[in-house]
Amino acid sequence: MVDWSTLPKDLLDLISKSLESSFDLIQFRSVCSSWRSAAEPKSPLPTHHLPILPDNGGSLFPDSAVGFRLSQRSILLIKPHEPCIESDSFGWLIKVEEDLNVPRKVTLLDPLCDTRNSIPENFPRVLDMSKFKVRELGREFKLHYFNTVGDIVESLYLEKAVVKYLDCDGDYKFVLLTIHVSGKLAVFRSWDRAWTVINDMPSPYDDVMLFDGRFFAVDNNGRTVVVDYSSLKLTLVASPVFGGDKKFLIESCGEMLLVDMYLSLEAVEGDPGFVEEIFEHPAFYMNERTVKFKVYRFVEREESWVDVYDLEDKMLFLGDDSTFSASASDILPLCDGSSVFFNGNVFNGEDLGAMQDRDLGVFDFRSGKIELVQKLPEYAKLFWPPPPWITSHARAEDHIGETSSQS
């Protein structure tokens, strides 16, 4: 049997430097003392403060003390090393945001949104990540308003942001791409310390993504462009895909996919004066409901999106600030794949109890049916609350260690 602890230090150093995820590096360093000594812990990313986005040529908040703080989150798939029973072989999805002030302390969030759930009493104060199989499925970046207005406007900026860090000898130079309130693309380059809003906009943009080292953006019609962060020029790489109401870009198995969400407007039932009220306040009395999805695969040489008719083992996840994918055989062995998970108006107001309720839905790509995840126990256990093998003291010991993340 090979003694892995005797691998050359230069080879271990090369392997450790190729691990982008801090969670992968934690598990690498926990193998043995020689691996631990060969790899330094990742330095936390510095706190980036960005000026406020311009609004039609001027700042929304003229006070220079107001701006954005950029934070990074990781979406993790956590599984037990050796499930006690077959039903425990499923994974648990969670989003973590590292505390910038307290090392190894993290905030636990819903993987598809920013919901922060109450921690159960039996949840360990310190979670030793070396006790589990941990895989990073995706990352996301969030722009938070800070200072003068604080939490009051925290939720005003809802658009997705993607970031590319440049290899500049530890200077942490980066480029950020997001969608301006006008629907145009906005770019921030750290060395310029300024925003640029790109005026090209045949249709408002729906999503942005970093794929294969390049920035991609798709508009509401499916027109897809690559954004050159040096010249700030856009290059058309795929013609429009008409039909749906909201487009999502997602990477899966090394390919870029386009997920097209179809919505339907439904009237909310009311008293006899309901019809008159609808005409007076149409937005208030209409409810958007997700009815179906279509999926396309990007073929760059043809500059087009090609229909995907079967997702096979794939499970696609559409979050508010990121998208990611996984295989059913890995994340949920007892279930089929070919599904799309999403945040949105799953059913009408009567089904959910309130017109504006939002919940987690799943679309079966083969049958075309949409269900609430909470009605499907086999899918619901992927999400909050944490599974028994997380909260069990037999697997999650309450002690402090370098491989631990404090929740």
Curated annotation (Swiss-Prot):
One of its GO terms (biological process) is protein ubiquitination. Its main location: nucleus. InterPro entries: F-box-like_dom_sf (IPR036047), F-box_dom (IPR001810), KIB1-4_b-propeller (IPR005174), SCF_F-box_domain (IPR051304). It comes from the Eukaryota. The keyword Transport does not apply. It is found in: Nucleus. Residues 2-50 form the F-box domain. SMART domains: FBOX. Pathway: Protein modification; protein ubiquitination. The keyword Nucleus applies. GO terms for cellular component: nucleus. Keywords: Nucleus, Ubl conjugation pathway. Component of SCF(ASK-cullin-F-box) E3 ubiquitin ligase complexes, which may mediate the ubiquitination and subsequent proteasomal degradation of target proteins. Part of a SCF (ASK-cullin-F-box) protein ligase complex. Interacts with SKP1A/ASK1. The F-box is necessary for the interaction with ASK proteins. This is F-box protein SKIP23. It comes from Arabidopsis thaliana (Mouse-ear cress). The lineage of its organism: Eukaryota, Viridiplantae, Streptophyta, Embryophyta, Tracheophyta.
